[in-house]
From Swiss-Prot:
PANTHER family (UniProt xref): UNCHARACTERIZED PROTEIN YQGE (PTHR30327), UPF0301 PROTEIN YQGE (PTHR30327:SF1)
Protein name, UniProt field: UPF0301 protein Rmet_2743
Gene source species: Cupriavidus metallidurans (strain ATCC 43123 / DSM 2839 / NBRC 102507 / CH34) (Ralstonia metallidurans)
Segments passing through the bilayer: none
NCBIfam families reported for this sequence: PRK00228.1-1 (NF001266), PRK00228.1-2 (NF001267)
InterPro entries, sorted: AlgH-like (IPR003774)
GO cellular component: cytosol
Entries under HAMAP family matching the protein: UPF0301
Signal peptide start and end residues: none
Family that this chain belongs to: Belongs to the UPF0301 (AlgH) family.
Length: 190
């Protein structure tokens, strides 16, 4: 009789690209997984700021930014899917029109009301705004994991919100107790 493996659930985990990641879209990336189930996975790259800050983006979408401390906060490349759309990863505070509560973790909101709340100071104090997201179809992420494409570890919101973006990859690796210089992108090699 065949046994079936229980499906893995990587929701609220970091995906850390292995050094040999061939896809330049994800090379050197850390992805926060907002959702992972039998239909696929959805995550946001948390360590790839782009050449636009909050003030510039808010000008483009006609929102008045009343809170100056966030004006120069960078906007991030969240992934290659729907890159014209904003995704806000934030602490689970406030109620917004279109939010996904990540079990045991944060919230991801796609509705403009969270940006309006951030702009006037009533929104979440800790947030990361991305353009686009990373998505995988059913079984696709599991296949990439089996081919040694990613490391996984329980996410730490402090890395997302308190660590500079250029240090997030190394900080996520440290959660595993691994020295990044000792990793090889090839299975079976040190």
């Amino acid at each position: 009789m065949a046994t079936s493996e229980a499906p893995i659930n990587l929701t609220n985990q970091f995906l850390i690209a292995m050094p040999g990641m061939a896809d330049p879209t994800f090379s050197g990336s850390v992805v926060y997984l907002c959702e992972h189930n039998e239909r696929g996975a959805l995550g946001l790259v948390i360590n790839r700021p782009i050449d636009i800050d909050m003030a510039t983006l808010f000008d483009k979408i006609d929102l008045k930014l009343e809170i100056q401390p966030v004006a120069h906060q960078p906007v991030y490349f969240g992934g290659p899917v729907q890159t014209e759309r904003g995704f806000v990863l934030h602490d689970p505070v406030g109620i917004y029109v279109s939010s996904l509560a990540v079990p045991g973790g944060l919230e991801m909101t796609t509705s403009k009301d969270v940006l309006e709340a951030v702009a006037n100071g009533s929104g979440p104090h800790r947030f990361l705004l991305t353009l686009g997201y990373a998505g995988w179809g059913a079984g696709q992420l599991e296949d990439e994991l089996s081919r040694n494409g990613w490391l996984t570890v329980q996410a730490d919101p402090e890395i997302i919100f308190s660590v500079p973006p250029e240090e997030r990859f190394a900080a996520a690796i440290r959660l595993l107790g691994i020295d990044i210089s000792m990793l090889s992108g090839d299975a079976g090699h040190a």
